[in-house]
Amino acid sequence: MHESSFYRITIDNKSFIVEFDNPNNKTLMVVNNISLEGKTVLVTGAAGFIGSNLVKRLFNDVKNIKVIGIDSITDYYDVNIKYERLKEIEAIAEGLIHDDSCSMENPWQFVHASIADKEAVEKIFTENKITVVVNLAAQAGVRYSITNPDAYIQSNLIGFYNILEACRHHEVEHLVYASSSSVYGSNKKVPYSTDDKVDNPVSLYAATKKSNELMAHAYSKLYNIPSTGLRFFTVYGPAGRPDMAYFGFTNKLVKGETIKIFNYGNCKRDFTYVDDIVEGVVRIVQHAPEKQNGEDGLPIPPYKVYNIGNNSPENLLDFVTILQEELVRAGVLPNDYDFEAHKELVPMQPGDVPVTYADTTPLEQDFGFKPNTSLREGLRRFAEWYARYYEN
């Protein structure tokens, strides 16, 4: 992948980043810049898979930053993994306190609460000057939404409304929030583009994520809140969610149980490694949609939506084969493991779709970035983490 060249310029007292996104054609991209230096960032879902990796990345990239994390730590999956993630964050933050280059007295603050708790959310905003909000808190899982709808209404709708209201009353420079590739529903056209219609969700989870995009657009229009929605595609990696296929399959294979491969293996997923997701989030967080007025003098909503995916869907059977090979390589499974005896091909489950495939052209054009971690490399890192974590 080519290296981009960035230059900071100032026009009419506004700071911009100018990027040559390709040294061969010298195409220019100009986007607003938000400096995170000396600022406070709120990350919701901070004990979650993406949230915890984002917090660690922010501390790695910006020495003088305060990050406030909020998470309800539900038992939707093993809470020990969530506490382990928080422990890693706390260790990094403790190191920053003793770093002479860090002027923040307390760079990390964790709030154990749900974003559906309006008072808890308001308290965070009242007591802190929040610059950027990254809303990653949500009840995840397509299949779980079929049997447990209440959890999705509370976290994904009421919780997101509370975040929007807080951003409305306490001016923030940028609201970035997690949407999902599931909003594309049963769309037949691939790759999925953010220009496609997404009016026919096939699960309640997808419906709540589409609702988030609509709510954010309304608040951007009414209250001029710069917001960016991110449609994530099948995120995986070390210390991930045990309910995801790669993690769940591994747990079952280790126990000698049979794994169910849906749609008889005729599924394709745009598996996206967590570090690539975080890279996209970090770039987008610092570049808010510009506030401007239209020809009628009324504000144009400072609102954007991007896909973050690998732009390379993998067949589920190929995915399982690579996972098995890497689990053997890492010593999680023995060399003579009988994989065929532990596979069962079953029909498609309600709420699932046969293919996910991200068109990442806007992400590449606006930020010069495209996820590029191969599935084998990503699953190798997961397998190595799994071997270490469960050995201990």
Predicted features along the sequence, with ranges:
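The catalytic Tyr-centered alpha-helix of NAD(P)H-dependent dehydrogenases
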Residues: P201-T208, F232, P238, P242-Y246, ...
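Generic alpha-helical secondary structure signal
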Residues: V132, L214, M244-G248, D318, ...
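Residues at alpha-helix caps and immediate loop-helix transition turns in enzyme cores, especially N-
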Residues: L54, I81-R85, R241-A245, F319, ...
